[in-house]
Amino acid sequence: MNFREERYDTIMFTDSHCPRVVADFFYEVESRFTTASSKVDGRLIGANPSGEGEDDEDVDDTSERVIDLVHANGFISVPYDLKSYKAQLKSYLKAIKERLQKTVPDKLPLLESQVNKYRKDVFANFDQYECFTGPSTNPEAMVVLMNFVCGR
């Protein structure tokens, strides 16, 4: 199942990352470090190096340690400070509230109360988060906050 940022129809994550709903409106998603390789496995494209007399040892294989969620979805790290993140969040929430007003207006009071609680914690610990946008890099789209939690 894909989870989308609805305003810009961007896939943010899938259920393979074990999402869970927090405070009725937010998702926390598990992610891990993994190694990504640039080496192309010729067998996946129909090549048979040993049968064709080719030696694939000359192929340059660069690998890097990546966060699986970031790598799989093309997220781009964005250097927000707290002030600029607050401004972005205010703009994003305004658009979300307008959408809810049209679709499910009875959820607005709950959204506002949960957002106020959730953002207090985020703002208090903002220096522990890394910010990402989706591959569209649209400045009005959702910002993904990543915080590493030990023991989960």
UniProtKB/Swiss-Prot annotation:
GO molecular function: calcium ion binding
Residue span, TCTP domain: 1-152
Family according to the record: Belongs to the TCTP family.
One GO cellular component term: cytoplasm
Main location: cytoplasm
Keyword Calcium: yes
Annotated protein name in UniProt: Translationally-controlled tumor protein homolog
Localization per Swiss-Prot or TrEMBL: Cytoplasm
InterPro entries: Mss4-like_sf, Mss4/transl-control_tumour, TCTP, Translation_control_tumour_CS, Translational_control_tumour_p
Annotated keywords: Calcium, Cytoplasm
Function as written in the Swiss-Prot or TrEMBL entry: Involved in calcium binding and microtubule stabilization.
SUPFAM superfamilies: Mss4-like
Native organism: Schistosoma haematobium
Signal peptide location: none
